[in-house]
Amino acid sequence: MDLSKWPLINWLAFLATIVINYFASGENAAVSDRIDIYFKPAGYAFSIWGVIYIALAVWLVLQLKKGSVANRQANRMKAGFLVSCILNGLWLLTFTNEWFIASLVVMVAFLATLAWLYYIAFRTSTSWLDRFPFSIYIGWVSVATIVNVFVVMNRERVTTLLGLDELAWTSLMLMVGVVLALVFMWWHRDFIYPLVFVWAYIAIFARIDNATLYVVLVSALILLTLGYVGLIIWKKPRAFLHHSRKTVE
């Protein structure tokens, strides 16, 4: 068992994050409910945090085994995981206090930190399982970052931007999300990341009441599904289970 600095710090940071999220979840939901934007998944979609935290907990257990893939990942991440936990809690602080511009700044930093953690996880192992916690984590925070942008626009009363209103920007960003998900899938041989977007888009569809967005969402989901299946057929399923990129021992 590896009880060195980073594995232990990671556990402490994770437990603190769970506690903070538990006590802040009610206020976070209340603030979110008061903000009426198109690009927002239905409440049930946020249950994905349970999957994320369970996956991270499993990874944290595995990182305690000296020499394991998770252990090598943790030691290469150094303070990265700790920083992600701090930013997670800091985002809750800014959002629940309705400091929305600050919350967006924190969210972007959070996403950048997760991108770094994902890169290390990707370079340490070829198996999709060894990066699953970070695939689903960065996927959901990618969606949350887009949501956060629309929250800021709403609270700052930005009704149009570059000549486009909220409906037009929502339609555009739904399609941008499709491209992002498929490019990420292709580049990293990651079949988990785009599934998070499918989950989010279905949840957005479940709560909206706008004919235009119905059409855009259905189109986005069809394109995402076709692209997803097409990439798997093109690259072969095995390429997504074990990528061929060079890893660091």
Q: Where do the PLM segments sit?
A:
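Membrane-interfacial loop-to-transmembrane alpha-helix junctions, especially the N-terminal start
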Residues: A70-F81, R189-P194
